[in-house]
A protein has these predicted regions:
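Catalytic core of pol beta-like nucleotidyltransferases
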Residues: 2-85, 93-176
């Protein structure tokens, strides 16, 4: 098992400094579960790219479906240390009324919160703000119920356009 010395205590201290709906006891219990997981850095890194691949498929589908030239897609890759998750947050620069029919046409039900991807099931949902944001999240089973609690985030990229997400996925597939 890969050990992260002191990470539980450090992550818990960070997590408890953030306003959240999760109680301190739940934070510690969940972090203890993560300590027992066999998740070394390579597993977490692979999960990050799995989320990127899942998001790339959705970005490409939206790019084809939203034909208006003023609609832009950007994404931020996020890696969460506390829940060992990886996610990409897709921001669609269009109104929610335009995005919903496209998602329904792609057979993606925003209310189901789950979509099947090449890398397995991913939790996904729409954040109904303006502009709407679609988050495609790849989370291990023990952490799935905590996926919407973004407590201790390891890092966030600057906004990436579709071409940059595509380039990163291709680079990873080639093993570089």
């Amino acid at each position: 098992m890969y050990r992260r010395p002191g990470s539980t205590l450090r992550a818990a201290k960070q997590a408890l400094q953030v306003n959240t709906s999760i109680s301190p006891a739940e934070v510690f219990r969940h972090l203890e579960i993560l300590e027992r997981q066999n998740d070394g850095p390579l597993v977490v890194q692979q999960r990050y790219f799995d989320a990127c691949e899942a998001a790339l498929g959705l970005m490409e589908a939206l790019d084809e479906a939203l034909l208006r030239p003023d609609v832009r897609l950007t994404g931020r890759l996020v890696q969460g240390h506390w829940n060992q998750s990886a996610e990409i947050r897709l921001r669609v620069h269009a109104s929610a009324e335009e995005v919903r029919p496209v998602l329904e046409h792609l057979a993606f039900d925003p209310r189901s919160e789950t979509m099947s991807t090449r890398v397995g099931p991913c939790t996904a949902w729409i954040d109904d703000q303006s502009p709407p944001m679609i988050r495609v999240i790849s989370v291990p089973s023990p952490a799935r119920k905590f996926a919407n609690e973004s407590l201790v985030v390891g890092g966030t990229t600057v906004p990436l356009d579709l071409d940059e997400v595509r380039r990163r996925c291709l680079k990873h597939r080639r093993g570089s």
